[in-house]
């Protein structure tokens, strides 16, 4: 949070940029670790931190795609066990991250169908 505040006040400051660069490997590792452990909410927090540190980093697009795919996978699993509410949330998260993620349209159709049947 302190770094985010410093970036907002002095984004071109050399020390602020150095601090962001030092933190970046830990933030990337955080995202990978949380995705591997299937903790997608925590993974999203790591992704958000990465985006704050390096908003133009080329790796963000792939990270967004991976996170969207994980939301789809977990949402689909939970939908299969009857948790429509979580599936709706997972769909929103995936759409917000990567509207072109493979499998998103099919997942959206399954969620809509289940949601309509839930009413």
Task: Please tell me what each predicted stretch does.
Residues 6, 50, 93-94:
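Canonical positions in the second alpha-helix
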Residues 24-30, 64, 71, 105:
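TPR repeat positional signature
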């Amino acid at each position: 949070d302190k770094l985010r505040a410093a970036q907002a006040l002095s984004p071109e400051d050399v020390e602020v940029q150095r601090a962001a660069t030092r933190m970046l490997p830990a933030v990337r590792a955080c995202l990978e670790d949380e995705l591997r452990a299937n903790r997608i909410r925590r993974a999203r927090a790591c992704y958000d931190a990465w985006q704050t540190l390096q908003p133009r980093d080329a790796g963000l697009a792939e990270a967004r795609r991976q996170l969207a795919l994980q939301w789809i996978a977990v949402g689909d699993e939970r939908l299969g066990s009857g948790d429509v509410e979580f599936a709706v949330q997972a769909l929103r998260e995936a759409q917000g991250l990567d509207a072109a993620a493979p499998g998103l349209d099919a997942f959206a159709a399954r969620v809509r169908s289940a949601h309509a049947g839930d009413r």
